[in-house]
UniProtKB/Swiss-Prot annotation:
GO biological process, one term: D-galacturonate catabolic process
Transmembrane region(s): none
GO molecular function, one term: glucuronate isomerase activity
Keywords: Isomerase
Keyword Zinc in annotation: no
UniProt cross-references to InterPro entries, sorted A to Z: Metal_Hydrolase, Uronate_isomerase
Broadest EC class assigned to this enzyme: isomerase
Source organism, top-level taxon: Bacteria
Assigned protein family: Belongs to the metallo-dependent hydrolases superfamily. Uronate isomerase family.
Pathways involved: Carbohydrate metabolism; pentose and glucuronate interconversion
Provenance organism: Escherichia coli (strain 55989 / EAEC)
Catalytic activity: D-glucuronate = D-fructuronate; aldehydo-D-galacturonate = keto-D-tagaturonate
Protein's recorded name: Uronate isomerase
EC number(s) given by UniProt: 5.3.1.12
Length: 470
């Protein structure tokens, strides 16, 4: 019987253990996509307690707690921090088989150093007190934890109208060497069908000093904000493409669509597709000219529980996997961006694992001469961000493309404790390659495979995003 979560956790061959301990474990972290609040990094925020750093805002945990019958007041409601933590501690023993069980105990191990102890109601007091004592120390501040975890770069997720003042403040502080850069997330300028679109256009027009009436005005406003982001070191964009659409339109049609929407008129699905296509093609060309990377997160079905959406708002754990077809529209969109050789470096993520092979083959259609891995099939995302999801994604990438050119893991998280997801990924990667070696499917060449592992863990992302590190 193998003990739970030793230093050789998941490393079930000698070759995997060598790969992880000698090549993967000590690689720095390049976390190119996350949802950390830049204000907390700028202020070097001190966490009040374990709830504040661990459960607050974590919709993964809330979903598990709800499934365990926990009342909403103990998830997102007005219960005390300790009551919410106790509700989570009572849920954890029921999460065996869910990645939350592994994540929870990895996060207690690093950075808190808690090993040999499982979170449950009987250990809740001890773990709460021990972690809170550590959180009072300087090296457990927001920046302190990032430094402990050997982070070199994080890419936050930011709206085009954001001032980026916190990024500027961080950049000016020469004592803090981790790069904290904005990522451009223009969903609100793109989702013309949303009720909030007109209000957002007014805000975008104000910050860009542009009167947005025609499509060219929107392009001008977005270009000004792209320049603003570039001035703050941005090299990455991110788009939530819940449904991939494609329909072409001329400028007069786009002007009419935008004008009618700004006048409060409803649009047809075809008109929505025309507008979204034009925005994505325009932005893709801008990214290509600037050397940016674009990310497409495809296939979420959001806000399914309308009653809870009205009570609690979005992003609180009521989203799931969509099953809309996407291959044909995605192909047309990428091909259109590529017509003038203005398809930027692109990472494609799918939420439905059914679509893994769709993306794994799609990226091969648009690779770039002289640019290894220009088109990437992104790491297992959201509901696929677990052991078999990551194994599936990497196995299919290896079979359909080049795993050796993969840019690797990202946290996609709102928590400063989620850096252990990189450790989890690295262990799974080494386990997978070790099994290939054990089965005679890959050579037992530790230098060849060790270098490949180092590249996937850090070097490929550093080179791909072309961000100068301190």
């Amino acid at each position: 019987m193998t003990p739970f979560m030793t230093e050789d956790f998941l490393l079930d061959t000698e070759f995997a253990r060598r790969l992880y301990h000698d090549y993967a474990k000590d690689q720095p972290i390049f976390d190119y996509h996350c949802h950390l609040p830049p204000q907390q990094i700028a202020e070097d925020y001190r966490f009040k307690n374990l709830y504040d750093i661990w459960l607050k805002g974590d919709h993964y945990k809330w979903r598990a707690m709800r499934t365990n019958g926990v009342a909403e007041r103990l998830c997102t409601g007005d219960a005390s921090d300790r009551e919410k933590f106790d509700a989570w501690a009572a849920t954890v023993p029921h999460t065996i088989g869910n990645p939350l069980y592994h994540w929870t105990h990895l996060e207690l191990r690093r950075p808190f150093g808690i090993t040999g102890k499982l979170l449950s109601p009987s250990t809740a007091d001890e773990i709460w007190n021990e972690c809170n004592e550590l959180l009072a120390q300087d090296n457990f501040s927001a920046r302190g934890i990032m430094q402990q975890m050997n982070v070199k770069m994080v890419g936050t997720t930011d709206d085009p109208i954001d001032s980026l003042e916190h990024h500027a403040e961080i950049a000016k502080d020469g004592s803090f060497t981790i790069k904290v850069l904005p990522s451009w997330r223009p969903d609100k300028a793109f989702n013309i069908e949303q009720a909030t679109f007109n209000d957002y256009m007014a805000k975008l027009g104000e910050v860009s000093d542009t009167d947005i009436r025609r499509f060219a005005d929107l392009q001008t406003a977005l270009t000004k904000r792209l320049d603003h982001f570039a001035a703050h070191g941005c090299k990455v964009s991110d788009h939530a493409l819940d449904v991939v659409m494609f329909a072409e339109a001329n400028e007069a049609e786009l002007d009419s669509i935008l004008a009618r929407r700004l006048a409060g008129e409803p649009l047809s699905e075809h008109e929505v597709a025309q507008f979204k296509t034009a925005v994505l093609v325009f932005l893709g060309a801008e990214y290509a000219r600037r050397g940016w990377v674009q990310q497409y997160h495809i296939g979420a079905l959001r806000n399914n529980n309308l009653r809870q959406f009205k009570l609690l708002g979005p992003d609180v754990g009521f989203d799931s996997i969509n099953d809309r077809p996407m291959a044909e529209e995605l192909s047309k969109l990428l091909s259109k961006q590529n017509e003038e050789n203005l398809l930027p470096k692109t990472i494609l993520y799918c939420l439905n694992p059914r679509d893994n092979e769709v993306l794994g083959t799609m990226i091969g259609n648009f690779q770039g001469e002289g640019m290894p891995g220009k088109m990437q099939f992104g790491s297992g995302w959201w509901f696929n961000d677990q052991k078999d999801g990551m194994e599936r994604q990497m196995t299919q990438l290896a079979q359909l493309g080049l795993l050796s050119r993969f840019v690797g893991m990202l946290t996609d998280s709102r928590s400063f404790l989620s850096y252990t997801r990189h450790e989890y990924f690295r262990r799974i990667l080494c386990q997978m390659i070790g099994r290939w070696v054990e089965a005679g499917e890959a050579p037992a060449d530790i230098n060849l495979l060790g270098e490949m592992v180092k590249n996937i863990c850090f070097n490929n992302a550093r080179d791909y995003f072309a961000i100068e590190l301190n």
